[in-house]
A protein has these predicted regions:
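Short Asp/Glu-rich motifs
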Residues: 48, 59, 88
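Helix-turn-helix DNA-binding elements, focusing on the entry/boundary residues of the two helices
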Residues: 25, 36, 47, 62-65
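Short alpha-helical DNA-recognition segment
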Residues: 33-52
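The alpha-helix within a helix-turn-helix
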Residues: 29, 40, 69
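N-terminal flexible/basic segments that precede or flank functional cores
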Residues: 1-23, 27, 31-32, 72-81, ...
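Residue-level detection of the helix-turn-helix DNA-binding "recognition helix"
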Residues: 30, 44, 55-57, 84
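Short, basic-rich loop-to-helix N-cap that marks the start of a DNA-contacting helix
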Residues: 57-70
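Alpha-helix N-cap/N′ positions at the starts of helices
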Residues: 17-21, 45, 60
Length: 103
């Protein structure tokens, strides 16, 4: 999955289908050519914690999503939207999320 040319979650989902934080983090790491250990160090996480995130065993809060987005250099909106969407799906709530910047 090549994540080099995209603009927002909708663009990613058009190209790859439903996207999750887990899928995004793993695909982004792989597109950067980094091992889990290297990527975990870059994010200030343990390798086990990163593995749990990449496998979808752990959900992240919107705040943590924003922090991770800054660390890897992607728009906060992307990971925040995916984190909220993952939480809704985990709760079996059939809603979709669209974020807009507050004015």
């Amino acid at each position: 999955m090549n994540l080099k040319k995209w603009h927002d979650v909708e663009d990613l989902e058009q190209r790859f289908g439903r996207m999750t934080v887990a899928m995004f983090l793993k695909a982004f790491r792989e597109s950067e050519g980094l091992s889990q250990i290297e990527y975990a160090r870059k994010l200030g996480l343990s390798r086990a914690n990163l593995c749990d995130l990449e496998k979808g065993r752990k959900l992240i809060s919107p705040e943590r999503a924003a922090k991770l987005a800054k660390q890897i250099g992607v728009p906060e909106k992307v990971l925040i939207q995916l984190a909220i969407q993952d939480t809704l799906q985990s709760a079996r709530l059939k809603y979709t999320v669209e974020l807009k910047t507050a004015s």
